[in-house]
Amino acid sequence: MIEVLVNDRLGKKVNVKCLSEDTVGDFKKVLSVQLGTASASKIVLQKGGSVLKDHITLEDYEVHDGTNLELYYV
């Protein structure tokens, strides 16, 4: 189990617990529930300026415990 910190452009920070084997799409579903957002499909996550694709695992993107991700809405 890892804990990932997600920041939006308004300064809101959310800690999300997940598995490193989870796909980005699964992570976005958990995140949307925590944020109270209607749809995970409206969420875009970035790490170091690169957009994370839904079908790739967090582990493949080298997202580890304590990693910061940027949150955007489309």
From Swiss-Prot:
Alphabetized PANTHER family for the sequence: UBIQUITIN-LIKE PROTEIN 5
Organism superkingdom: Eukaryota
UniProt keyword terms in alphabetical order: Ubl conjugation pathway
Tagged with keyword Transport: no
Designated name of the protein: Ubiquitin-like modifier HUB1
Keyword Disulfide bond: no
Segments forming domain Ubiquitin-like: 1-74
Signal peptide: none
GO biological process: protein modification process
Alphabetical list of InterPro entries matching this protein: Hub1/Ubl5, Ubiquitin-like_dom, Ubiquitin-like_domsf
